């Protein structure tokens, strides 16, 4: 599990078009999926943050076991991206679940902010309430604003809120 201040693990994962993406910093890594109501509720807020912070590389990673949850298969991910259009971040598949494990991801969503030096600076929920769009991913945005200002993140960790990651058995 990666702790606040630790060097973030590197990764290379395929997106919905089969292109590989490797971690570039500074970054926001969001473990997410296609079926969790929490992940779906926060998706637009996270996409808006990706558009508002082009100086950060955003990655959406789906680690769920697609055999038990076919709605999280690479094909279903591809269909979702095509249906919704204009995703401002690559949607990556963590088939082995190794990336989710080394980060210590627990839920969808689970957000990790990595600074330009590759260190984990924030981990947790995008904001306090998935049902309140007016919160606009405020915890994530606060962390990104602190990094932009070269300040310590005031709230470096919050409890991730969402559906448990569906681990392979």
List PLM regions with ranges.
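Chalcogenol-based redox active-site neighborhoods
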Residues: 1-148, 153-157
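Disulfide-stabilized, aromatic/cysteine-rich ligand-recognition loop
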Residues: 151-169
